[in-house]
Every structure is written in C-alpha cells, then in structure tokens.
C-alpha cells in the first residue's frame, strides 16, 4: 500500500489538493540522527507527494513534525536536495514554499508546467518524474536519461518508426538489416560468444566499448546480483546499438575470472536472466511489436584441464523502439490517492504535444493555449481565426477596472440587489478591504463549473482583487450546515480548472467563504473562512497583469468546450464559445425555460444545444435519460447520442413514442420539421409543462435560411416565438464559402419561399462573418458522371497527400436514391487512386469518406465537401438547399452543377 499511494485528504476546510504524509522528522541536525531506513522512507513519502501534486495542478503537502519541538525549523538538506532533483531546477522556490504552524509543517506546491520564465536553457517536460528509468550507452558507461534526454530519445524513436513504416518492405530496409548483421559479426566479442570454452585468467583481446561491458560475479548472492544489473545494462544496450554484457570478466585487467562451478548452476542462471529480461517494460511506436531480442551463452571456464566455472555472455540486439529498466517513477493524484503512472501512460504524457494540423487547418485556427507552456493535465485550446482571442474575451466579459472594484455582470447585480434586501450591503462590506479588482457574480458558480446547483444559494461571487488570493463567496438565504461544503467543493473545482483546463501557470489558490443573508437583520456573515492554512504571499495577485492572466484562464474554463476537431485529429482539443454564444448560454434556465434561438448557418447552434443540455443536468439535478434532444435526421441523432449527454431521437420517433420520463427537451434544426406525422411543438410543450410547479426546459434552435422543404414546419408564427435570441456571428466557414452563402441568402431575401417568415430575413443585416479564414469555393459545370467521380478521386488524393484524412471529406448528393447510384462508381474511381472506404453519415466517427444526401447531413460538418448536382423538386427552395450544402463545408467546397 505504501509503495503505491499515500492517503489524500480533501477536507471540508480545504479547497485544494492536500496530501497528508504523516510524521516527518524535520531540521538538518534531527534528520542526521535518523537511521538511514527511516530517513529514506520519510523522504520517499514527501517526494511522491510532491511529484503527484506537481503533475495534478498543485496543492499542499501537510506533515506533522516527528520531533516534538514547535520552534521554527528548516526541512533538512536531504529533503531540499531531493526536491531540487525532482524538478531538475536550482530554485526550489519556483515550485515549492514552506510554512510552519506549531508542529504542522506545510509545503505549498505549484503546478508543473513548461514555464516561459525558464530562460536559462532549462527544460520542463510535460510531466515531472523522479526517474525516467531509461538508459543508453555513452562510451563505456551506462547513462541514465534525464527528462530532456528522455524526451529527445522518445521523439527520435517515434520518427524512426514512422520512417520505417513508410518504407516498410523496400530494399533499403533489408540492406540496413544486413549491415547490422555484418557489424554484429565483426565485433571482436562475437568470437568469444561463439566459443564453448575459455581458459581461466585469459586476457581478452578487446576492451570495453559502447557495445561491450565487463562485470565480475559477486562472491555472494550471484543470482540476485545478475538479476539486479540486467535492467540497466540490457535496456541500455537495447536502446543504443546493441552489445554484449560479459559477466565474469575483470573490467580493469580484462582477465576472464568466471564464477566457480560450486557457486552457480548454469540452467538456473539462464532462467534468472530470462525472467529479468522478460520483466523489462517496453513501449512500441511500430506495428510489429517484437520483444527484446537477446541470446545467453554460458561459456565453460577451464583451469588447465579442470572445469573451474562459468563465464556468462548476454548478446543484446538493438531494439526497434524503447526499453525501460523498470516503470518510470512518476505519480499523479487520482481518485483521492497518489497513483504511479504506468510506462505507457508516462510515455504518452511525456510526448504530449499540440496536434499536427494539415496546412490549411493551421492557417484557419489560432492557438489560445499551447501545451508547450501549460500544466500537465491541460489540453490545447484553439479558436477560429478572426474570432476573439482569450485576451479580448477577458476584456469584454471580465475587464479589470483601474483603481476600483466592480461587480459584473451589471444586469445580474442589479437584479439580485432588488430581489434580496441587504445583499448589496453584505457584499460591499466584504469588499471594503480591497481597492482594485472585479467581483464576478453568478446564480451558481457550481453550475458554471459543471457541478450541480445547490438549493438555498442566492448567488456565488468570485473576487479577483489586487494583493489578495481569489476568494469565492457563497451567499445563502439562511444558515445551512452543507453550505460550507458546497462552497469549498466549488472553490476546489475552480482552482483545479483554472490550472488544469485554463492553463494558469502562476501560484494560485481559491479561498472559500460562506455568507448568510438572515431575514432578521440586514446581513450576517459566517466567519468560517476557508482554511486555517495561511498561503504564502506569492499566492496573492500582485497587480493588473496577474489578475488579467488569471481571468484569461477563467475565460477558457467558462467558454471552453470539446471541439469537434477532436474526433478528426485523434486527440482532445478545446474551442471557445464566442462572447455572443456565452451570453446566451449564461442565461438563467429557471427564468428562460422556453427559448427560441435563431442562428445563421455556421453560428454554432448545435454546439449551443449540447452545452445547454449539460447545464440543464446540473441546474435541475436530472439524469441524462430525462433530457431529450430531437432533430429531423438519423445522422445528427446518432452524432448527439454518441456524446452520452441526453436521449436523442428523430422527430418521427418523438411523435410515435410517449416519453413518460422526459422532463426537458432541446430541439435542433427545427426549420426542417414537418407536421404530417403530428403536432410536434404541441407535444413538446405538453411534456415540458407536465409538472406545473416545476416545468421543464424547452429550447428550440432553427435557421429559416436552411429550410429544405416548402411544407409547414410546425413552428409557431414568428411573432409568437418569444422569448427569442439570435446567433449572428458566423464562425464555421472559410471566407470564399461564406461569400457564396451570402450570395444565396441574398437570393432568398429577394424571392423568399412561401414558408419562410419575411420578418426573419432581417437577421442577415445583423450578420458578422469571421474574416481571414483560408479556403476555396469552386463551381464546376457540365461535367459527366465519369468526369465528376474522377475529379473527386483526384482531388481527395491531393488532400490526403497534404495531411488530410478520409474523415475530413463528405460527398453530398440530392437524394438517398442518388447515393446508391454514385456509390459504386465513386468507390471504383477512388480505389484506382488509393484505398478508401465510403459510408453514410450515420457513422461520423469512422475513418471513411461520407457519402450521403444534403438533407441527411444537416447539422453536421466536414472540412472538405463535394456537392454533386444539387437540385430540388421546386426551384423556389434551391438557394436554401445550396446554403445547406455550402454551410457544411468548413474550408473547401466543390459544387458540380
């Protein structure tokens, strides 16, 4: 138990990760008096805790001084040196600070990160490790790799594996194998390895070298000795160019001494060697995944004509990938315990890097948070080029006023002040000690952080002020025994997310304080401040620059969401909501149980729908199966269903079944709904209003410009669609595609179909198109079917050569019947150029090109879209269909007319 984890307490009074390592002897003189075993055990507990906190967002190590003296004392040189070795950095205070309160001693640990302030050439890997457990040969020595060397080594091995994969089966690789064989056989040690006998005292004709190591047998515990040296030496040879480990040769004189036959059994020794090598952890970047290749030779050592003993020679081949001596020594906090990282986890985190975008992607997105200078658990954050940077969003949403303190958002501040007498005075009283900063109000900071709302909370207020740590205030209607737990848990989550999601690299804690607005008097404060721990002064925000840096991390926490790019890139990437999207998202669900959201093509309606369902779950404490998402087509239904945030159904299924357990409904792409199967809007209203005392949420997202039929949609008249919000910031499409969409929208305005309300068309005048995103639109006319499929295949091949994959491409036709007509011809043309699969849009996560109809692809997107002969039964809605088609393409659009 001790070797794997220490107890971790997140106590009700601690809104931080606090690891209690028990009793530790402190002070240099006191530690010198300890037995070595006890000193090592205490040091190991502290170092494991420090490493785990560094890799988990920072926190506090708490210990009780084993020496009964309460006078101030230092840690001890061995502890300090071990902490310096852990961070591989000379200045302990960059990551650690200490405080003592009586017999309680605290080490405050800042999160690990590739901090930009390391200007002296120091290197911070993605995670902190006590040991990489990686070795290589360096001259005649075995070199233990530090973090920088381990990172470079892993990257080199990864590149070699990729190169070998690309050139697999080609003659050059066979030549390289032959070259290795010749080098191996030309090694002078090879002759000894081939012999069966050797004379005691013979001096070998070759010295130690990068490929040769001499070791003597120890006189006692021979098998244990061999088992102990194998991990370092065998892994070092395997990680370099291979080599020979001689056991039984004096390394100075090169004399063969062997081991007396009475002290060793050859077969047992071979078994020990095999067992030790089989335990070596290996990590592969290649597809073949072989084990470590080695051979063991036991050579008989004769003294004259008498058998004296044995010489052991282990021949190791260079390994294709990476061999460790043991699992790397690195820890993280998981499920309230310190857990060691597995070898595979360690390699994955060490090599964690910003994703490699295809060239066009890189031009279309701007980095908001890079892994190169962020804490270990962060994911990269990108925004579409032309959208607000996190600094702009911070200035818009949470500006730091010069020289005074402000409450924001102002509308919520006024509303709460009018609703709750004495609230303004209570908050003002708490703010008096602070001269500059911002108080960010929320009806529930817990909900904002994806936690459940607590009944009885009037509001939460986050104070970000100069010369203070951040403080989270929870204001209760009346005293509540669970109020402090709620506030502490919320503050804890906020601190963790500021670091591990928002990428804040400074020293930070969030104190928690509960206030009670009692009915008898104007205000009554519960003075139980968060933590008896007094954080060091460096945890306070020194000025405007520090406050703004923290608030920019807060922007990522509040506006960040899992990007749809994650599925395409194969790693988790975050995007940011626009300010307009966030303002709608932050509306009170209790006051906006029904809302119509009108959004232009590419304005993020489906993303908003997903975010709102997550918020519903936390505000109303409901399970995912009580939230229903309804759309028109099966592919979008499947896409949402795979997110596991709700129950998702099509309109037809919604009208056919009863849904007795559903409480909240979110409807997407409502402009394409129909009424031939029944009145879906009336049914949705009936379901969400079943509970008169607590009606459910009904939010409806739509865009009349993307209406794909001339029938009645079942939506209420435009004049009855209130309350209503609009999404007018178009964020999806490249410039040329956006221009094409605008042209088609203008045609609709000039001659609108009969089922599009004229009042809706004015939304176009409010549109804001994000400029500067590269891409192209190409309209191709009068191609034959053969020419079309050949053009698509050739163009796809060019895109794949540039780094795109089949999952970036969609080919859209007018009807499902046409899908069948095009499939065989398109597949035949594709397979002349490359091996590729086609599938419909119901499986959006597979590695294939999507071939489906424009209507069924509604609500989905791809970087590259080919539209083949888009047409409709009624020409009046052709511009709508073309908008539906074009708006699915993020960067490259090809339309065959």
Curated annotation (Swiss-Prot):
Entry's EC annotation: 3.1.-.-
GO BP terms in the entry: defense response to virus; rRNA catabolic process; tRNA decay
Cofactor binding: number and manner: Can also use Mn(2+).
Annotated residues for binding of Zn(2+): 284, 286, 321
Positions of the UniProt region annotated as N'-domain region: 2-355
One example GO MF annotation: zinc ion binding
Binding sites annotated in the UniProt record for ATP: 599-606
Gene3D superfamilies (UniProt xref): P-loop containing nucleotide triphosphate hydrolases (3.40.50.300), Schlafen, AAA domain (3.30.950.30)
Mutagenesis or variant effect for residue 213 to A: Abolished endoribonuclease activity
Domain comment, as recorded: Shows a pseudo-dimeric U-pillow-shaped architecture of the SLFN13 N'-domain that may clamp base-paired RNAs.
Stated name of the protein: Schlafen family member 13
Biological source species: Homo sapiens
Organismal lineage: Eukaryota, Metazoa, Chordata, Craniata, Vertebrata
């Amino acid at each position: 138990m001790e070797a794997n984890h220490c107890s971790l307490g997140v106590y009700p009074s601690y809104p931080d990760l606090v690891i209690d390592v028990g009793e530790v002897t402190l002070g240099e003189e006191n530690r010198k008096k300890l037995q070595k075993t006890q000193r090592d055990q205490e040091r190991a507990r502290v170092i494991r805790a420090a490493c785990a906190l560094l890799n988990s967002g920072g926190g506090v190590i708490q210990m009780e001084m084993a020496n009964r003296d309460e006078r101030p004392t230092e840690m001890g040189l061995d502890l300090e040196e071990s902490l310096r070795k852990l961070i591989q950095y000379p200045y302990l205070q960059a990551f650690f600070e200490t405080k003592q309160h009586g017999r309680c001693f605290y080490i405050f640990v800042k999160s690990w990160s590739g901090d930009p302030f390391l200007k002296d050439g120091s290197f911070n890997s993605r995670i902190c490790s006590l040991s990489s457990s990686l070795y290589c040969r360096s001259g005649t020595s075995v070199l233990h790799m530090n973090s920088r060397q381990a990172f470079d080594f892993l990257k080199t091995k990864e590149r070699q594996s990729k190169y070998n994969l690309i050139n697999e089966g080609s003659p050059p690789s066979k030549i390289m194998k032959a070259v290795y064989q010749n080098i191996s056989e030309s090694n002078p040690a090879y002759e000894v390895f081939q012999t069966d006998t050797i004379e005691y005292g013979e001096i070998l004709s070759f010295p130690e070298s990068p490929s040769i190591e001499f070791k003597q047998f120890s006189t006692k515990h021979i098998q244990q000795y061999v088992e102990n040296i194998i991990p370092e030496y065998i892994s070092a040879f395997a990680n370099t160019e291979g080599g020979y480990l001689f056991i039984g040769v004096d390394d100075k004189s090169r004399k063969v001494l062997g081991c007396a036959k009475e002290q060793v059994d050859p077969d047992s020794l071979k078994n020990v060697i095999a067992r030790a090598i089989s335990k070596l952890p290996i990590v592969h970047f290649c597809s073949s995944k072989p084990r470590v290749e080695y051979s063991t030779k036991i050579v008989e050592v004769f003294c004259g004509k008498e058998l004296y003993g044995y010489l052991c020679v282990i021949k190791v081949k260079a390994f294709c990938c990476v061999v460790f001596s043991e699992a790397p020594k690195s820890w993280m906090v998981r499920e309230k315990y310190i857990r060691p990282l597995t070898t595979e986890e360690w390699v994955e985190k060490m090599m964690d890097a910003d994703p490699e975008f295809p060239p066009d992607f890189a031009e279309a997105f701007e980095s908001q948070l890079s892994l190169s200078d962020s804490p270990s658990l962060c994911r990269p954050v990108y925004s579409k080029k032309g959208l607000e940077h996190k600094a702009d969003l911070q200035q818009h949403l949470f500006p730091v006023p010069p020289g005074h303190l402000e409450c924001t958002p102002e509308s919520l501040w006024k509303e709460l002040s009018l609703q709750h007498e004495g609230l303004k005075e209570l908050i003002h009283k708490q703010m008096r000690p602070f001269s500059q900063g911002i108080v960010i109000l929320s009806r529930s900071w817990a909900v904002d952080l994806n936690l459940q709302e607590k009944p009885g909370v009037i509001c939460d207020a986050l104070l970000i002020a100069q010369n203070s740590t951040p403080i989270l205030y929870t204001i209760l209607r009346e005293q509540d025994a669970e109020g402090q737990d709620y506030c502490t848990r919320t503050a804890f989550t906020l601190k963790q997310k500021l670091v591990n999601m928002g990428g804040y690299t400074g020293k930070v804690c969030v104190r928690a304080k509960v206030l009670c607005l009692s009915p008898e008097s104007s205000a009554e404060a519960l003075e139980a401040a968060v933590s008896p721990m007094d954080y060091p002064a460096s945890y306070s925000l020194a000025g405007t620059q520090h406050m703004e840096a923290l608030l920019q991390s807060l922007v990522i926490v509040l506006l960040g969401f899992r990007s749809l790019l994650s599925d395409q890139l194969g790693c988790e990437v975050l995007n940011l909501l626009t300010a307009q999207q966030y303002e709608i998202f932050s509306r009170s669900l209790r006051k906006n149980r029904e809302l119509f959201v009108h959004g232009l093509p590419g304005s993020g309606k489906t993303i908003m729908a997903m975010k709102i369902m997550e918020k519903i779950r936390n505000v109303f404490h409901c399970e995912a199966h009580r939230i229903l998402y309804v759309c028109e087509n099966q592919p979008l239904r499947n896409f949402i269903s795979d997110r596991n945030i709700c129950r998702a159904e099509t309109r037809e299924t919604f009208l056919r079944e009863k849904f007795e357990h559903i409480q909240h409904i979110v409807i997407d792409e409502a402009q394409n709904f129909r009424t031939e199967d029944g009145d879906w809007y009336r049914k949705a209203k009936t379901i969400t209003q079943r509970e008169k005392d607590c009606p459910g949420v009904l939010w409806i997202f739509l865009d009349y410009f993307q209406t794909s039929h001339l029938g009645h949609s079942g939506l209420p008249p435009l004049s009855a669609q209130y309350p209503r919000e609009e999404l007018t910031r178009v964020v999806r499409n490249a410039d040329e595609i956006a221009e094409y969409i605008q042209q088609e929208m203008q045609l609709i305005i000039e001659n609108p179909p009969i089922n599009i309300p004229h009042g809706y068309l004015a939304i176009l005048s409010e549109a804001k198109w994000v400029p500067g995103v590269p891409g192209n639109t190409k309209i191709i006319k009068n191609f034959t079917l053969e020419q079309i499929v050949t053009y698509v295949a050739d163009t796809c091949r060019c895109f794949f050569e540039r780094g795109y994959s089949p999952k970036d491409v969609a080919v859209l036709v007018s009807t499902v019947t046409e899908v069948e007509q095009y499939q065989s011809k398109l597949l035949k043309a594709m397979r002349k150029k490359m091996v590729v699969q086609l599938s419909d849009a119901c499986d959006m996560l597979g590695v294939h090109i999507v071939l489906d109809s424009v209507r069924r692809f509604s609500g989905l997107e791809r970087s590259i879209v080919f539209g083949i002969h888009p047409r409709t039964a009624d020409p009046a809605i052709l511009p709508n269909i073309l908008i539906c088609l074009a708006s699915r393409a993020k960067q490259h659009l090809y339309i065959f007319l």
